[in-house]
Amino acid sequence: MYPLNANSYTLLRKLGSGSFGVVWKARENVSGDIIAIKQIDLETGIDDITDIEQEVFMLSNCNSSNVIQYYGCFVDGYTLWILMEHMDGGSVSGLLKMGRLNEQVISIILREVLYGLNYLHGQNKIHRDIKAANILLSSSTGNVKLADFGVAAQLSNAASRRHTFVGTPFWMAPEVIQQTSYGLAADIWSLGITAIEMANGIPPRATMHPMRVIFEIPQSEPPKLDDHFSPTFRDFVSCCLDLNPNMRWSAKELLQHPFIKSAGTVKDIIPLLVQKENKLFDDSDQSVLEETINNTLKPFEEPIAEGNADIEDWTFETVKKSDSTVLGNTSIPKNSIISSQNKEELPSSIKYLEKTIMSDQATPHPFSKSLSEKGSSYHKSLTSDFAMKHYIKSTIRSMLLNDKLSATQRSSLESFYTSFISLDKNLSSKFVNQITPDNRLHHKKQKRSPISQLLFSRWLEETEKRRSLNG
């Protein structure tokens, strides 16, 4: 048990950052043990307390050698500290920076991830964000562990969350995008996409605009590996990527698949992890915090610049191109293209949205810019986001009124609109809370869980101290 106070730790190096805060490599001062510490700003994250609480709950209730170990949490000032196991090998996404992985390495990693998923699914827990960036490695033991439970769900007490639009678009199961009730099989789909990601260096459709990906996944046939991969590997992927979630193999069943049964030991991947002179990756590759799915909207605010960032630090505004270095012979599938019709007959506002969805480039719309400039500097980003979401919703509604849309186009738009509304459902209340005086004192009047009450009480104490000092 590690001490639960900030003075007991020395922060050594930033490992990653995301929507909630920062992850540090840290040393416990007495024992000298190296751990990872996730710091979350409770002032900026107060509206997301449910997600923060969910991660703490999930981690504290896991006891598996293939899941990152949780050591405890405490509040210091306005910051929540979550103490976790540190993995010195970084992430699989970091490993992919040096090239695509061969099937031997992939089978080992997949087997270890399946052990973790089999454990979670046995407790009716869904991870909901399986991808290479959330699979961490140990360079000393070769151990492989699942991390980042910020969007995980407990099926037994979170039925409503099974309809929630969460995760990362490229790895999302069709039923998640379509907002139908989903379960453990959603993780299996993401695992299949991750298998392709490790084989090709990038996930399927990685060069497409994320909005376009959301359209395509439910409407298209599942991705497949090229024929030059082994039949057993291709069959494994197909067992994961069935459009019907009921037809996907379970984690327990996949552990018996020939591709997994033939995998070597975790020690076989250590040589890759210890080649520091080749700079396979460093601590900065351990990105255990990722932007949430709401950041899919970022391309509407900033231009997309392909190829200038790594997929591990994905924020839905850049994408990593395939590395030419190959650790095993593989090839990258060509992008599929969505055709469009009657563009010139559509109103300019509709053509703007269509261009955004159907292309890999996006620029800010004047409506968003003009409205955001009217707000104060404190609320500028929120106002801009509010304006853009309002604009997108009204534009989609206008597009649906166009009688020249084909049945397929109309179905795609309706599916997208439903998903978008889900993303936007809490925006209005958050906007009102941000501009209402003392909103945080009224934000959580409903009954709080023990963790939520602890954080809220600590916040009130610090607020009172601040008022006393200023008074």
From Swiss-Prot:
Q: Which SUPFAM superfamilies match?
A: Protein kinase-like (PK-like)
Keywords, A to Z, come to: ATP-binding, Cell cycle, Cell division, Cytoplasm, Cytoskeleton, Kinase, Mitosis, Nucleotide-binding, Serine/threonine-protein kinase, Transferase
Asked if the keyword Nucleotide-binding belongs to this entry, the reply reads: yes
Give a Pfam family name.
Pkinase
Q: Which GO terms describe its molecular function?
A: ATP binding; protein serine kinase activity; protein serine/threonine kinase activity
Determine the domain of life of the protein's source.
Answer: Eukaryota
Tell me yes or no: is Plastid among this UniProt entry's keywords: no
Q: What is its main location?
A: cytoplasm
Residue positions binding ATP? 15-23, 38
- The residues covered by the Protein kinase domain are 9-260
Q: Where is the active site?
A: 129
Cysteine disulfide partners in this protein: none
Provide the reaction this enzyme catalyses: L-seryl-[protein] + ATP = O-phospho-L-seryl-[protein] + ADP + H(+); L-threonyl-[protein] + ATP = O-phospho-L-threonyl-[protein] + ADP + H(+)
Q: Which cellular compartments is it found in?
A: Cytoplasm, Cytoskeleton, Microtubule organizing center, Spindle pole body
An example Gene Ontology biological process: cell division
Any one GO cellular component localisation term in the record: new mitotic spindle pole body
Give the EC number(s) under which this enzyme is classified.
2.7.11.1
Membership in a protein family: Belongs to the protein kinase superfamily. STE Ser/Thr protein kinase family. STE20 subfamily.
What this chain does, per the entry, is described as: Has a role in the septation initiation network (SIN) required for cytokinesis.
| Subunit architecture | Interacts with cdc14.
Q: Which PANTHER family match?
A: SERINE_THREONINE-PROTEIN KINASE SID1, STERILE20-LIKE KINASE, ISOFORM B-RELATED
Which named protein is this?
Serine/threonine-protein kinase sid1
Biological classification of the source? Eukaryota, Fungi, Dikarya, Ascomycota, Taphrinomycotina
